[in-house]
Curated annotation (Swiss-Prot):
Lineage: superkingdom: Eukaryota
Name of the protein: Oogenesin-3
Expression (tissue specificity): Expressed in ovary, specifically in oocytes. Detected in follicles with two layers of granulosa cells, and are present in early as well as large antral follicles.
Species whose genome carries this gene: Mus musculus
Similarity-based family: Belongs to the PRAME family.
Length: 500
């Protein structure tokens, strides 16, 4: 039997049924999509006999194009244990969400379920996974059983271990104090079906806290199932309010604190130092925390030891940016054993020119066998500060990424720095500041000098190893914000305005 491509596109269901036996899967996928767009009722009626391999592509097409009846009908027949909608939810509307949840309601209401349906976990909003998660076997290890695949599982975790008919995992974002309509509807839906549905929030983002919204979230969501928490634009009083919930987050892996001020939520008054110290000391211990990112948080100054006290397991990634540190903050580093296995250390926009960095050098020596990424950017570091780090830096043999941009180093000292980094054979990304000789007395960038000095600097590295991705960059222009970048491949400089 032969069928031409023109006949294949004709609206003849009998011919299409015959084509199933002779055409490749890719052709069948195309045919299924065409039929989907033309006859919604036919697709729904054919679901019982539809091959498993066609379910994902038809579901995707229905989701993107808003075929809510098809979505509702497919859920009770889903032939895989997992359905990860992933990035598709970014552009979906409330009507689409309701259709998916209506499908789950049909499934829950069935006294005798179809032998074909194997759905156990619906991943609704998950930025880390795309739509490929609907294919069988793609993410099965993540939820079998709950929390057992974590590196540091918590032994006593009854809430997350509850066995219910279905699990729905999602990410929630409270923006400007409120949830969006879809998240609100999902929470209300889950609350009404709490006996049969287990709603898990893996990632919670809060930007500007509204207490009523947070209370409603934790009436439904188990805090000990949250693995990523991002807090933006809060005051210390807000952290005090969140503290009871933070104490329940025994499985938290990543924590971001961004722009936390000392102003009270009511009025412009500020907390006294004693109140601040009390609140900071009450921050809970996180048994599983692996990544900590702190940006523009005023209470870090003089209290870094209290922050690091919250760690129970060794930290993997530590980032501090747009903060001020005291000498006592640095002095505590050699005694914080929970940062001695760091893979990534980022200190960004922190003035260090007035501090003794010997303790930081000790930390680098302690993590020399684990550290892979080191960023000391825009820290106003000069030669005395770098001198304290160079002996330990040259021992960090596992480093793959380094950035020392926006620090003040002379040409002579930059050569000395490169003599040390030339020994680091695993480096694949390097960002160095242009030497001070590339500026005149007024701070004007002398781009021709950058082009003159950089080949000489590169030769220092090439004598020991072949650099991969490397650049020498001037400080940003105070007027336009752009900077000159020397590219070794073209042996020319260029004016850039993109983020490095």
């Amino acid at each position: 039997m032969m069928i031409c491509h023109q006949c294949l596109d004709q609206d003849d269901s009998s011919e299409e049924e015959e084509a199933v036996s002779v055409y490749s899967p890719s052709t069948l996928v195309k045919l299924a999509r065409q039929r989907l767009l033309r006859e919604e009722a036919l697709v729904i009626s054919a679901l019982k006999g539809l091959p498993n391999m066609l379910f994902p592509v038809i579901f995707e097409e229905a989701f993107i194009n808003g075929h809510t009846k098809i979505l509702k009908a497919m859920i009770p027949m889903w032939p895989f244990p997992y359905l990860s909608v992933g990035a598709l939810t970014n552009n979906c509307n409330l009507k689409t969400l309701k259709a998916v949840l209506d499908g789950l309601d049909i499934l829950l209401a069935q006294k005798v379920r179809s032998s074909r349906c194997k759905l156990r976990v619906l991943k609704w909003r998950d930025e880390q996974h795309d739509f490929c998660g609907i294919w069988p076997g793609s993410h099965e290890a993540e939820d079998l059983p709950e929390l057992m695949t974590q590196k540091h599982p918590v032994q006593n975790n009854p809430d997350c271990g509850v066995k219910k008919e279905l699990r729905v995992t999602t990410e929630l974002s409270v923006m400007k104090g409120r949830l969006d309509d879809s998240a609100t509807y999902l929470l209300e839906w889950a609350q009404q079906r709490k006996d049969s549905i287990h709603l898990l929030c893996r990632k919670l983002v809060i930007e500007t806290l509204t207490k009523d919204t947070v209370i409603e979230i934790f009436k439904i969501v188990n805090a000990d199932c949250i693995q990523e928490l991002e807090l933006y634009s809060l005051c210390l009083e807000d952290l005090a309010f969140l503290n009871p919930y933070l104490r329940q987050m025994d499985n938290l892996l990543e924590l971001t604190l961004d722009h936390v001020t000392d102003s009270l939520s009511m009025g412009d008054s500020e907390m006294c130092e004693e109140e601040m110290i009390t609140l900071v000391s009450q921050l809970p211990t996180f048994p599983c925390l692996q990544k900590l990112c702190v940006n523009d948080v005023y209470f870090i100054y003089g209290n870094l030891n209290e922050i690091l006290r919250c760690l129970k397991k060794p930290l993997v990634s530590f980032c501090i940016s747009n903060c001020e540190l005291s000498q006592s903050d640095l002095d505590c580093l050699p005694y914080c054993l929970n940062i001695f296995e760091l893979k990534c250390l980022y200190l960004i926009d922190i003035p260090l020119n007035h501090l003794c960095l010997d303790p930081l050098g000790f930390l680098l020596e302690s993590v020399r066998h684990t550290l892979e990424c080191l960023e000391l950017k825009s820290c106003d570091m000069g030669e005395p500060q770098f001198n304290a780090l160079l002996p330990a830096l040259s021992q960090c043999s596992h480093l793959t990424d380094v950035s020392f941009w926006e620090n003040e180093l002379s040409l002579l000292f930059l050569k000395q720095l490169l003599q040390h980094t030339s020994k680091l054979t695993q480096l694949s990304y390097e960002l160095y500041p242009a030497p001070l000789e590339c500026y005149d007395d007024r701070g004007l960038i002398l781009s021709h000098r950058l082009e003159q000095f950089c080949p000489e600097l590169l030769d220092i590295l090439r004598a020991k190893r072949q650099p991969k991705d490397i650049a020498f960059v001037t400080n940003p222009c105070s007027k336009c914000g752009r900077y000159y970048v020397y590219d070794p491949k073209t042996q020319r400089f260029s004016l850039e305005d993109t983020t490095l």
